[in-house]
From Swiss-Prot:
This is Probable cell division protein WhiA. Pfam families: HTH_WhiA, LAGLIDADG_WhiA, WhiA_N. Involved in cell division and chromosome segregation. GO terms for biological process: cell division; regulation of sporulation. GO terms for molecular function: DNA binding. Keywords: Cell cycle, Cell division, DNA-binding. The keyword Membrane does not apply. Belongs to the WhiA family. HAMAP family: HTH_type_WhiA. Residues 277-311 bind DNA. PANTHER family: CELL DIVISION PROTEIN WHIA-RELATED.
Length: 313
Protein backbone atom coordinates (compact mmCIF):
# COMPACT_ATOMS: atom_id res chain seq x y z
CA UNK A 1 0.00 0.00 0.00
CA UNK A 2 1.34 3.42 -0.97
CA UNK A 3 1.67 5.71 2.05
CA UNK A 4 0.49 9.30 2.23
CA UNK A 5 4.14 10.41 2.59
CA UNK A 6 4.96 8.53 -0.64
CA UNK A 7 2.19 10.39 -2.44
CA UNK A 8 3.58 13.70 -1.22
CA UNK A 9 7.09 12.82 -2.40
CA UNK A 10 5.77 11.58 -5.74
CA UNK A 11 4.16 14.96 -6.33
CA UNK A 12 7.32 16.82 -5.33
CA UNK A 13 9.50 14.77 -7.68
CA UNK A 14 7.17 15.60 -10.57
CA UNK A 15 7.64 19.37 -10.20
CA UNK A 16 9.63 21.09 -12.95
CA UNK A 17 13.32 21.57 -12.14
CA UNK A 18 13.95 25.32 -12.18
CA UNK A 19 17.55 26.18 -13.19
CA UNK A 20 17.81 28.99 -10.63
CA UNK A 21 16.62 26.85 -7.74
CA UNK A 22 18.10 23.44 -8.62
CA UNK A 23 21.30 24.05 -6.64
CA UNK A 24 19.48 24.76 -3.37
CA UNK A 25 17.40 21.59 -3.64
CA UNK A 26 20.43 19.55 -4.72
CA UNK A 27 22.48 20.91 -1.81
CA UNK A 28 19.96 19.43 0.63
CA UNK A 29 20.12 16.01 -1.04
CA UNK A 30 23.92 15.88 -1.12
CA UNK A 31 24.41 17.29 2.37
CA UNK A 32 21.88 14.93 3.95
CA UNK A 33 22.21 11.73 1.89
CA UNK A 34 25.49 11.91 0.01
CA UNK A 35 28.27 9.40 0.71
CA UNK A 36 31.73 10.56 -0.37
CA UNK A 37 34.52 8.14 -1.37
CA UNK A 38 38.09 8.64 -2.57
CA UNK A 39 39.65 6.19 -5.05
CA UNK A 40 42.95 6.79 -6.85
CA UNK A 41 42.91 10.45 -5.81
CA UNK A 42 39.45 10.87 -7.35
CA UNK A 43 36.29 11.73 -5.42
CA UNK A 44 33.07 9.78 -5.97
CA UNK A 45 29.71 10.77 -4.49
CA UNK A 46 26.85 8.28 -4.06
CA UNK A 47 23.22 8.85 -3.13
CA UNK A 48 21.11 5.74 -2.54
CA UNK A 49 17.32 5.49 -2.42
CA UNK A 50 14.58 2.90 -2.83
CA UNK A 51 12.39 5.46 -4.58
CA UNK A 52 12.97 5.58 -8.35
CA UNK A 53 11.27 8.98 -8.67
CA UNK A 54 13.69 10.48 -6.15
CA UNK A 55 16.64 8.95 -8.03
CA UNK A 56 15.38 10.54 -11.25
CA UNK A 57 14.93 13.85 -9.43
CA UNK A 58 18.54 13.86 -8.20
CA UNK A 59 19.74 12.96 -11.71
CA UNK A 60 17.76 15.89 -13.16
CA UNK A 61 18.97 18.34 -10.51
CA UNK A 62 22.63 17.51 -11.19
CA UNK A 63 22.16 17.70 -14.95
CA UNK A 64 20.26 21.01 -14.74
CA UNK A 65 22.64 22.66 -12.27
CA UNK A 66 25.95 21.47 -13.71
CA UNK A 67 25.34 19.92 -17.13
CA UNK A 68 26.64 16.54 -15.95
CA UNK A 69 24.84 13.21 -16.27
CA UNK A 70 25.66 11.03 -13.25
CA UNK A 71 25.54 7.25 -13.32
CA UNK A 72 22.25 5.62 -12.34
CA UNK A 73 22.71 2.08 -11.02
CA UNK A 74 19.78 -0.21 -10.20
CA UNK A 75 20.21 -3.27 -7.99
CA UNK A 76 17.96 -5.66 -6.09
CA UNK A 77 18.23 -5.92 -2.33
CA UNK A 78 18.53 -9.53 -1.19
CA UNK A 79 17.22 -9.00 2.34
CA UNK A 80 13.74 -8.51 3.76
CA UNK A 81 11.34 -7.32 1.03
CA UNK A 82 13.96 -7.54 -1.72
CA UNK A 83 13.12 -4.08 -3.03
CA UNK A 84 15.06 -2.46 -5.83
CA UNK A 85 17.72 0.02 -4.81
CA UNK A 86 18.70 3.02 -6.92
CA UNK A 87 22.15 4.55 -6.69
CA UNK A 88 23.01 7.90 -8.26
CA UNK A 89 26.80 8.15 -8.59
CA UNK A 90 28.62 11.39 -9.38
CA UNK A 91 32.22 10.94 -10.54
CA UNK A 92 32.94 14.16 -12.42
CA UNK A 93 33.69 17.55 -10.85
CA UNK A 94 32.75 16.20 -7.41
CA UNK A 95 35.09 18.51 -5.52
CA UNK A 96 34.04 21.55 -7.57
CA UNK A 97 30.34 20.84 -7.08
CA UNK A 98 30.64 20.26 -3.33
CA UNK A 99 32.62 23.48 -3.01
CA UNK A 100 30.13 25.41 -5.14
CA UNK A 101 27.24 24.15 -2.98
CA UNK A 102 29.20 25.10 0.16
CA UNK A 103 29.29 21.54 1.44
CA UNK A 104 33.11 21.84 1.35
CA UNK A 105 34.92 24.94 2.59
CA UNK A 106 38.10 26.39 1.06
CA UNK A 107 40.21 23.95 3.12
CA UNK A 108 38.16 20.92 1.99
CA UNK A 109 36.49 20.77 5.39
CA UNK A 110 32.88 19.58 5.67
CA UNK A 111 30.26 22.28 6.24
CA UNK A 112 27.31 20.69 8.05
CA UNK A 113 25.19 23.83 8.41
CA UNK A 114 23.11 25.51 5.71
CA UNK A 115 24.89 28.25 3.67
CA UNK A 116 24.03 31.91 4.27
CA UNK A 117 22.89 32.38 0.65
CA UNK A 118 20.10 29.90 1.38
CA UNK A 119 19.42 31.16 4.91
CA UNK A 120 18.89 34.68 3.51
CA UNK A 121 16.71 33.85 0.48
CA UNK A 122 13.08 32.82 0.81
CA UNK A 123 12.97 31.18 -2.63
CA UNK A 124 16.15 29.20 -2.02
CA UNK A 125 14.82 28.28 1.41
CA UNK A 126 11.70 26.80 -0.20
CA UNK A 127 13.82 24.74 -2.61
CA UNK A 128 16.15 23.58 0.16
CA UNK A 129 13.23 22.50 2.35
CA UNK A 130 11.81 20.54 -0.58
CA UNK A 131 15.12 18.73 -1.01
CA UNK A 132 15.43 18.12 2.73
CA UNK A 133 11.94 16.62 2.94
CA UNK A 134 12.59 14.38 -0.07
CA UNK A 135 15.93 13.33 1.43
CA UNK A 136 14.81 12.42 4.94
CA UNK A 137 11.31 13.68 5.65
CA UNK A 138 8.05 11.96 6.52
CA UNK A 139 4.45 12.94 7.21
CA UNK A 140 1.65 10.93 8.79
CA UNK A 141 -1.63 10.18 7.05
CA UNK A 142 -4.00 12.86 8.40
CA UNK A 143 -6.97 10.51 8.14
CA UNK A 144 -5.66 7.72 10.35
CA UNK A 145 -2.79 9.07 12.47
CA UNK A 146 -1.90 11.96 14.73
CA UNK A 147 -0.76 15.04 12.87
CA UNK A 148 3.02 14.86 12.47
CA UNK A 149 5.62 15.92 9.91
CA UNK A 150 9.36 15.63 10.48
CA UNK A 151 12.77 15.95 8.81
CA UNK A 152 15.78 14.05 10.16
CA UNK A 153 19.30 15.52 10.27
CA UNK A 154 22.53 13.86 11.28
CA UNK A 155 24.09 17.13 12.48
CA UNK A 156 22.73 19.43 15.18
CA UNK A 157 23.72 22.69 13.45
CA UNK A 158 21.97 21.59 10.25
CA UNK A 159 18.87 20.73 12.27
CA UNK A 160 18.90 24.16 13.90
CA UNK A 161 19.29 25.85 10.53
CA UNK A 162 16.29 23.91 9.18
CA UNK A 163 14.35 25.12 12.21
CA UNK A 164 15.30 28.72 11.42
CA UNK A 165 14.25 28.36 7.77
CA UNK A 166 10.87 26.97 8.76
CA UNK A 167 10.19 29.53 11.48
CA UNK A 168 11.92 32.74 10.37
CA UNK A 169 10.65 32.69 6.79
CA UNK A 170 7.40 30.79 7.05
CA UNK A 171 6.30 30.99 10.73
CA UNK A 172 5.60 27.26 10.95
CA UNK A 173 6.16 26.98 14.72
CA UNK A 174 8.48 24.02 14.13
CA UNK A 175 10.10 22.27 17.10
CA UNK A 176 13.31 20.26 17.42
CA UNK A 177 14.39 17.23 19.40
CA UNK A 178 17.10 14.58 19.54
CA UNK A 179 16.37 11.30 17.76
CA UNK A 180 18.66 8.29 18.27
CA UNK A 181 21.90 9.15 16.47
CA UNK A 182 20.64 12.44 15.07
CA UNK A 183 18.10 15.24 15.33
CA UNK A 184 14.68 16.12 13.93
CA UNK A 185 12.61 19.19 13.29
CA UNK A 186 8.90 18.49 13.44
CA UNK A 187 5.43 19.99 13.08
CA UNK A 188 2.41 18.90 15.11
CA UNK A 189 -0.17 21.51 14.11
CA UNK A 190 -2.39 20.44 11.23
CA UNK A 191 -2.59 23.95 9.78
CA UNK A 192 1.21 24.32 9.80
CA UNK A 193 1.68 20.93 8.12
CA UNK A 194 -0.66 22.08 5.36
CA UNK A 195 1.34 25.30 5.06
CA UNK A 196 4.61 23.36 4.77
CA UNK A 197 3.25 21.15 1.99
CA UNK A 198 2.19 24.26 0.09
CA UNK A 199 5.57 25.94 0.64
CA UNK A 200 7.56 23.04 -0.83
CA UNK A 201 5.20 22.73 -3.79
CA UNK A 202 2.97 19.77 -2.89
CA UNK A 203 -0.23 21.69 -3.63
CA UNK A 204 -2.40 18.68 -4.44
CA UNK A 205 -1.21 16.87 -1.33
CA UNK A 206 -1.95 20.00 0.70
CA UNK A 207 -5.51 20.23 -0.64
CA UNK A 208 -6.09 16.53 0.09
CA UNK A 209 -4.61 17.02 3.57
CA UNK A 210 -6.95 19.96 4.26
CA UNK A 211 -10.00 18.02 3.07
CA UNK A 212 -9.13 15.06 5.28
CA UNK A 213 -8.34 17.35 8.20
CA UNK A 214 -11.65 19.17 7.94
CA UNK A 215 -13.61 15.94 7.81
CA UNK A 216 -11.58 14.45 10.66
CA UNK A 217 -12.01 17.54 12.84
CA UNK A 218 -15.71 17.59 12.08
CA UNK A 219 -16.02 13.95 13.12
CA UNK A 220 -14.10 14.66 16.30
CA UNK A 221 -16.34 17.61 17.07
CA UNK A 222 -19.41 15.47 16.54
CA UNK A 223 -18.05 12.78 18.85
CA UNK A 224 -17.43 15.32 21.60
CA UNK A 225 -21.01 16.52 21.54
CA UNK A 226 -22.27 13.31 23.16
CA UNK A 227 -25.26 14.96 24.83
CA UNK A 228 -26.71 16.27 21.60
CA UNK A 229 -29.28 14.55 19.49
CA UNK A 230 -27.43 12.25 17.06
CA UNK A 231 -29.77 12.87 14.16
CA UNK A 232 -29.46 16.64 14.49
CA UNK A 233 -25.68 16.38 14.73
CA UNK A 234 -25.53 14.31 11.55
CA UNK A 235 -27.77 16.77 9.77
CA UNK A 236 -25.60 19.69 10.93
CA UNK A 237 -22.35 17.97 9.97
CA UNK A 238 -23.66 16.99 6.53
CA UNK A 239 -24.99 20.48 5.87
CA UNK A 240 -21.70 22.03 6.99
CA UNK A 241 -19.72 19.59 4.84
CA UNK A 242 -21.81 20.51 1.78
CA UNK A 243 -21.34 24.20 2.55
CA UNK A 244 -17.58 23.73 2.88
CA UNK A 245 -17.54 21.80 -0.40
CA UNK A 246 -19.44 24.61 -2.16
CA UNK A 247 -17.14 27.26 -0.70
CA UNK A 248 -14.00 25.36 -1.70
CA UNK A 249 -15.32 25.02 -5.26
CA UNK A 250 -16.01 28.75 -5.44
CA UNK A 251 -12.58 29.52 -3.99
CA UNK A 252 -10.90 27.34 -6.63
CA UNK A 253 -12.97 28.35 -9.67
CA UNK A 254 -13.97 31.94 -8.93
CA UNK A 255 -12.25 33.32 -5.83
CA UNK A 256 -14.00 34.12 -2.56
CA UNK A 257 -12.89 37.75 -2.85
CA UNK A 258 -15.10 38.13 -5.93
CA UNK A 259 -18.28 37.31 -4.01
CA UNK A 260 -20.46 40.02 -2.46
CA UNK A 261 -18.87 41.09 0.82
CA UNK A 262 -21.50 39.43 3.04
CA UNK A 263 -21.03 36.10 1.27
CA UNK A 264 -17.23 36.40 1.42
CA UNK A 265 -17.32 36.98 5.18
CA UNK A 266 -19.67 34.05 5.74
CA UNK A 267 -17.72 31.71 3.43
CA UNK A 268 -14.40 32.36 5.14
CA UNK A 269 -15.98 32.03 8.58
CA UNK A 270 -17.51 28.67 7.63
CA UNK A 271 -14.16 27.36 6.34
CA UNK A 272 -12.54 28.08 9.70
CA UNK A 273 -15.53 26.87 11.75
CA UNK A 274 -16.97 23.80 9.98
CA UNK A 275 -18.18 22.34 13.27
CA UNK A 276 -20.67 25.13 14.10
CA UNK A 277 -24.42 24.76 13.64
CA UNK A 278 -26.45 27.25 11.63
CA UNK A 279 -27.58 28.91 14.86
CA UNK A 280 -24.00 29.21 16.13
CA UNK A 281 -22.83 30.63 12.80
CA UNK A 282 -25.60 33.24 12.92
CA UNK A 283 -24.49 34.32 16.40
CA UNK A 284 -20.74 34.35 15.76
CA UNK A 285 -20.26 35.44 12.13
CA UNK A 286 -17.99 38.56 12.07
CA UNK A 287 -20.59 40.91 10.55
CA UNK A 288 -23.33 39.53 12.82
CA UNK A 289 -25.12 38.56 14.82
CA UNK A 290 -27.82 37.94 12.24
CA UNK A 291 -30.88 35.76 12.17
CA UNK A 292 -30.70 32.04 11.50
CA UNK A 293 -32.90 32.53 8.43
CA UNK A 294 -30.55 35.27 7.23
CA UNK A 295 -27.56 32.93 7.43
CA UNK A 296 -29.51 30.20 5.68
CA UNK A 297 -30.41 32.62 2.88
CA UNK A 298 -26.73 33.50 2.37
CA UNK A 299 -25.75 29.83 2.25
CA UNK A 300 -28.46 29.27 -0.37
CA UNK A 301 -26.87 32.04 -2.46
CA UNK A 302 -23.47 30.35 -2.08
CA UNK A 303 -25.06 27.03 -3.07
CA UNK A 304 -26.55 28.60 -6.22
CA UNK A 305 -23.20 30.12 -7.24
CA UNK A 306 -21.42 26.78 -6.72
CA UNK A 307 -24.10 24.98 -8.75
CA UNK A 308 -23.68 27.48 -11.58
CA UNK A 309 -19.89 27.00 -11.57
CA UNK A 310 -20.35 23.21 -11.73
CA UNK A 311 -22.67 23.54 -14.72
CA UNK A 312 -20.25 25.87 -16.51
CA UNK A 313 -17.44 23.32 -16.10
Amino acid sequence: MVSYASDVKKELTSLPVHPEHAKAELAAFLRMNGVLSLHDHQFSLDITTENPAIARRIFSLIKTAYGIEPLLIVSKKMKLKKNYQYLVRLQKQVHEILTDLEIFDSNNGLITGIPEKIMSSEQRAMSYLRGAFLASGSVNNPETSRYHLEIYSLYEDHNQDLLKLMNNFFYLNAKETRRRSGYIVYLKEAEKIGDFLHIVGAVNAMLAFEDLRIMRDMRNSVNRLVNCDTANLKKTANAAAKQVEDIQLIEEKFGLENLPEKLTVLARFRLTHPELSLKEVAAQVPDGPISKSGVNHRFQKIREIAKQLKEEN
